[in-house]
Amino acid sequence: MDELKDVIPITESLGLWHPQEGIVNGHFKSQKGEKIKILGQLRHGCAKIVEDPRFVPDGPHKLAVADMITGYGVAESVRHFYDLYHGESLEGKTAIIQGWGNVASAAASYLTVAGAKIIGIIDAAGGIIDTKGMGIEPVKKLFLEKKGNKLNSPDMISFEETNEKIWGLGADIFIPGAASKLVTRPQVDAMIASGTRVIACGANVPFVDDEVFFGPTANYADTQLSLIPDFIANCGMARVFAYLMQPDAELTDEAIFDDVSQTIRKALTDVKQYRPDPTGISTTALELALKKLMKVEMGH
């Protein structure tokens, strides 16, 4: 489901200016003049074409904030994780990617810009294994040439062969960025055994036995490696909504993207202050989030 192509036309046909109009009315209780201004910011900011070359690959298609921001946040969560927990950059780190839709392909692109190499991509119809690692240009080409939300390349091998090989490649980073509930315990075991250090959830509830929150596989992964939960890693679009609901929000690419990056960094900083160990990130983050919600609920 695409926000710009699918959701907004439906809500507009129902007389709403923006899908977040209920939040503006109910949560913020905005006055009429302020409400119109905030809804205008939401309409403009989400659909804004990204022009700053730092945030978009140059190509024939115009890309909006809504197309790029979630994948950007996923990549930034990994970059901030390495900086905060290990004092390292992404230079020379390796990654495998599950999916090649907006989130997965954008995350892969931003990871390469930060210095990482993509050594494997697995998509529904096949995948690519490149143990030397793909940098900015090859990944940009794959990003620009995807067919809808699907990987499209003459270098693709079958799904079966990719699935057999990719989990044991020894990538530092894994981005589950396809549908929910796909990642299995044997896949997690193979990644742990081959040295994977961090999983950043581009997909919501990516593990096969997840329910509303973490199932057994997610809990296990959280004890064995660094698992950045979906509500931090892929909060990009939700955070853009919150940013655009501020009065007089600056509607530049830099301001919007930087706000998402800093929000993710702050969340990981809070987790690290509470629990400095690089395991248990998801459990700790959920505990902190629930505490904040309880405070709000109780009126503190």
Please give the residue ranges for each predicted region.
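Glycine-rich phosphate/diphosphate-binding loop of Rossmann-like nucleotide-binding domains
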Residues: 54-168
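Structural motif
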Residues: 8, 13-23, 94, 119-120, ...
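Rossmann-like adenosine-cofactor binding region
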Residues: 126-227
